[in-house]
Amino acid sequence: SPGYAYERAPDQQHFLNRERTKTMFREILSRGRGGKNWDFTNSTLFMDFLAGNQTYECTPWSMPLLTVFGWQKPCYLLGEGYVKTFKELMEGTEWEKYGVGKYEKCANCMVHCGFEGTAATDAIRHPLKSVPILLRGVKTDGPMAPDIDLSRQRPAEFVFSRHVEKKMSEIRTGKSDTTEAAAAE
């Protein structure tokens, strides 16, 4: 997956935006017959998405992450909070507020934790859609699929450090109630 401009990285200008990501993947994949020369563990439709041939929405709930702090929400790249249980993650996260075109932090994201699940769902719903890619490889030239409009996304909120500081304070004082049993629910 492409590098993602997460808020804690000190060097923000070297992360790829969506257009540069698509161009880079097209250049790389064109050297390997659209990826046919290499074994990838990602789905064909996800690779096709990275090359700009699919327009996908993020599904961050498709790859949830459990940490020592609890279940990270909405995804492990944003880390905008933690909850104790999987049920609380799934039912208490306002999923509609996240994703490309919805949240400024997500504007350039094309990472597997948000889009591989979308590509897998697309492959299940449209099983023949992968066949041309399997036979000929990922298309590396021609027009790209339209991208998602960013004009109505909400501004970024920088909250990660606050969440970590709070949890570390709880751990130091022995007041942390995050347990394996609670997290597994």
Label every model-predicted segment:
Residues 1-63, 68, 73, 77, ...:
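Radical SAM enzyme [4Fe-4S]-AdoMet core and its adjacent flexible, acidic
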